[in-house]
Amino acid sequence: MEIGILDIKGSLPLFEDFGNLPTKIITENNYKEIKDLDALIIPGGSLIESKSLNDDLKKEIINFNGYIIGICSGFQILAKKIDIGRKSSVPIIKEGLGLLDVEFSPLVCTDRVEFEVKKSIFGEGKGEGFHCHTYGNIEVVDKETKILTVSKVKKLNYKLGAEKEIISGAFKGKVFGTMVHNFLDNEFVRDNFLKHLGVTEDEKEEIFEKNKIIKDELKKRALKYRLNPKLLKENNKKDVNKKRGIILLATSSNSGKTFLTTALSSKLNGRVFVAKIGGDVRDIVPALYLLREKMTKYNSIKIGERGWVDVSKFLDYIKKSDYDYIIVEGVMGAFTAALKNISSYQIAKKLGFPVYIVSACNISGIEGAFVEAMAYYSLLKDIGIKVEGVILNKVYDWNSFNKLKSLAEKHNIKLYGVGKIANESRGLIPEVEIDYESFCRNAFNVDLEIEIPEVEINNHIKDEEDNFLERLDNWMENINKY
């Protein structure tokens, strides 16, 4: 029994376990072996945006007579058409393989979900998983294509509302697709599929053993190690009790937190865990792509009703883990929604990790970005946050930056600069359209080395609200003293 997993540019073959079913890695080099498989799993990623499937690979998949299971982007590639034109004045239509009579259009969903499997080779019943997509609105355009999964979601296009059901999967003949990540990790789904294939218990164990081997191989092929092979040789855990961590908080949205999270992840020698404050886990997928790490419920820290696990559960998980570094990415600006007690700074205070303030120079100029960062620096320190330093992103004038750096050093403030990307196209914008390979390669090329301090993890969190208005009042009193 051979079950292939497609490992090509833009794919996420370790984003989930896929039921521990894959036994063979399929790449651009051995794609002709697809015909010998019993089944092929096409994982999520940025397969559409990365233009990853060449004509020969497409032909091999179309002519394959075994079972095909596409997850998220792997499902989209099986469809007829995909409109990736989010925030575009006109649709941007990409052609799929046409194996499923389905069309996609923009719909953002990053929920953990309960889904229902309709009667199929996977059985029928309810399971759990998560959505992580930008264009997930599904229209089934032919009666021969049947609905495979329906998901219950509460948040669509960033808006929380009453729970509703959306079509999340479809199938036709031997071709199956779903937007639900962890679909195959539901035991009943996996076991019904294996039963349909006539797999015995002994064969099942053989599959699992093969899967362990290819997971190790897939990990070694992570982009991080391909870009810097030395890190693979040196990637040894020295002390399970010592962990280093930071939180990236910004002065506003679109400051480049995701880009910097990915850049930092590419440099560190050791196991890196990335997490997002709030529910938009799409922001950390580039780092997970680079690292070839799995998305778990602990990668999203709950803020209000958005996100997956609360702070104490996150810290408990981290404390018991064998990760060397923890990088937490904030949501929007550090103080956004602080009056409602659902801001990034309030989560940062509970986490107790040191903070770097990110301020982008493309809106109010390099001088304005520095002044904004200093205001955030001052207020966060007043509140009791450990502020480690400031990162000015999208720097366009290094002469001006160096003057500001000298000034910051005079006042014992660490200031770092990251240059502006030459061409920030749609494929480099996480919330719109992203090519993971290009995004991560750009991030790897960033010259950024910051100190990531050792952290003491205290998972006994006091459940108390921080009075932001009072904090602000005290801070403003100090301002008026001048």
From Swiss-Prot:
<dbReference type="Pfam" id="PF01656">
    <property type="entry name" value="CbiA"/>
</dbReference>
<keyword id="KW-0315">Glutamine amidotransferase</keyword>
<keyword id="KW-0808">Transferase</keyword>
<dbReference type="GO" id="GO:0009236">
    <property type="term" value="P:cobalamin biosynthetic process"/>
</dbReference>
<dbReference type="GO" id="GO:0005829">
    <property type="term" value="C:cytosol"/>
</dbReference>
<dbReference type="InterPro" id="IPR029062">
    <property type="entry name" value="Class_I_gatase-like"/>
</dbReference>
<dbReference type="GO" id="GO:1903600">
    <property type="term" value="C:glutaminase complex"/>
</dbReference>
<dbReference type="InterPro" id="IPR002586">
    <property type="entry name" value="CobQ/CobB/MinD/ParA_Nub-bd_dom"/>
</dbReference>
<dbReference type="GO" id="GO:0016740">
    <property type="term" value="F:transferase activity"/>
</dbReference>
<dbReference type="GO" id="GO:0004359">
    <property type="term" value="F:glutaminase activity"/>
</dbReference>
<dbReference type="GO" id="GO:0008614">
    <property type="term" value="P:pyridoxine metabolic process"/>
</dbReference>
<protein>
    <recommendedName>
        <fullName>Putative glutamine amidotransferase-like protein MJ0138</fullName>
    </recommendedName>
</protein>
<dbReference type="InterPro" id="IPR002161">
    <property type="entry name" value="PdxT/SNO"/>
</dbReference>
<dbReference type="GO" id="GO:0042823">
    <property type="term" value="P:pyridoxal phosphate biosynthetic process"/>
</dbReference>
<dbReference type="InterPro" id="IPR027417">
    <property type="entry name" value="P-loop_NTPase"/>
</dbReference>
<dbReference type="InterPro" id="IPR033949">
    <property type="entry name" value="CobQ_GATase1"/>
</dbReference>
<feature type="domain" description="Glutamine amidotransferase type-1">
    <location>
        <begin position="1"/>
        <end position="203"/>
    </location>
</feature>
<dbReference type="Pfam" id="PF07685">
    <property type="entry name" value="GATase_3"/>
</dbReference>
<dbReference type="InterPro" id="IPR011698">
    <property type="entry name" value="GATase_3"/>
</dbReference>
